[in-house]
Amino acid sequence: MVVKIGILKCGNIGMSPIIDLCLDERADRNDIDVRVLGSGAKMNPDQVEEVSKKMVEEKPDFIVYIGPNPAAPGPKKAREILAASGIPSVIIGDAPGIKDKDAMAEQGLGYVLIKCDPMIGARRQFLDPVEMAMFNADVIRVLAGTGALRVVQNAIDEMVFAVEEGKEISLPKIVITEQKAVDAMDFANPYAKAKAMAAFVMAEKTADIDVKGCFMTKEMEKYIPIVASAHETIRYAAKMVDEARELEKATDAVSRKPHAGDGKILNKCKLMEKPE
């Protein structure tokens, strides 16, 4: 059977551009069909309501909503619509959503909250399209290299497998910490694991710095260097995960878990071997 997945992208976090791609990295899975709707960079209640209702009309087997701060007004509107739809739904968000995780569970929604997916330094005097793209590229590298991406991908794949097997979907309820992330990555070298953990914590700190620069500091001459320092922090976090991967490469021990054509998750470590 083919499982129909609905993905709602409202606003953007680092995981947003790759949430659909990580399920079908070579575009050759024959067991899923993905539909993506979104409201662009904005996530105001009216825009989120419009695309959420359109997604419900598509009647997918389950819905994945992804965007910043699931506790904000726009995402809360999506949560209301999805909870009332009767379609199994999971909310993927960043650390600010942790304070609402119990409320999401009470609504009958699953959640995957990523602590290393930081907010951007959204000050006009600093952030232009180039800076935005470079920041998100660094965040994606951290998500991938620490194992956070793999936790998200596995959670969604488990939902796919449940539908294929005719079972009731067990909605994920996950807060991704540095330990959860690196455990999913199957590091062989303990120094590589340590570097990935350090990168994860640096990404968490990036969020704290950007919150300070965007919301807690009013003087321009103060907040510009604050948000700039946050972006420098995530840049070095991305370099740290590169170093971790290079350590794994050096001993031919990079964990790779590609999808088979039927969606099964395969496994390999040595570069020249076939995944099984």
UniProtKB/Swiss-Prot annotation:
Oxidoreductase keyword on record: yes
Key words of the record: Methanogenesis, One-carbon metabolism, Oxidoreductase
First-level EC class: oxidoreductase
EC number: 1.5.98.1
InterPro entries named among the record's database cross-references: MTD, MTD_sf
Main function: Catalyzes the reversible reduction of methenyl-H(4)MPT(+) to methylene-H(4)MPT.
Protein name stated in the entry: F420-dependent methylenetetrahydromethanopterin dehydrogenase
Organism: Methanococcus vannielii (strain ATCC 35089 / DSM 1224 / JCM 13029 / OCM 148 / SB)
